[in-house]
């Protein structure tokens, strides 16, 4: 089901892009840095790609693809036991939406789409029994979550062929019946042609 939704979203955005190349007035391709804070986890970092198509109107279409990842380790020790854990998070989002050109230099945009998050957790521990025997245990948990993602931002064109953008991206992920917010930013530079 998740793959079907992702494939459908990709086809829709690809259709916009294909049509854009056929009748293109102005295109912008940009790449940038993305960083988000996952609730109850540390920051995840990655890359953001933007594509924008403008025609003879102040309203245009923009698409965004983001990939981020991060990992966190923790350990706990008391008198009789030691536990070590590691969590890896991967995040993907695909969004599209309208952009509005305020003047020759500044535009604002809004995005809506889907975000897919995956977490892999591994826990390893040892326990020392009273008789001196050591008992080891380990566990691995893999969870996935797909939710609606949203974003907004500003694009600046200081010169005709240069594009600078800064934006917000947000969603949530549900793992083990707990919802975790994911909020972050992306900044980038692009070429307008």
Feature-to-residue mapping (PLM):
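Short glycine/proline- and aromatic-enriched beta-strand/turn motifs that initiate or cap beta-hairpins
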Residues: 20-74
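Transmembrane beta-strands of outer-membrane beta-barrel pores
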Residues: 33-37, 65-71, 90, 114-120, ...
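Residue-level signature of outer-membrane beta-barrel architecture
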Residues: 35, 53, 98-100, 114, ...
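Outer-membrane beta-barrel translocator domains and adjoining extracellular loop/strand segments
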Residues: 40-46, 72-82, 120-130, 175-183
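Cleavable N-terminal export/targeting peptides
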Residues: 1-26
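Residues that define the transmembrane beta-barrel architecture of outer-membrane proteins
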Residues: 25, 43-47, 88-92, 144-148, ...
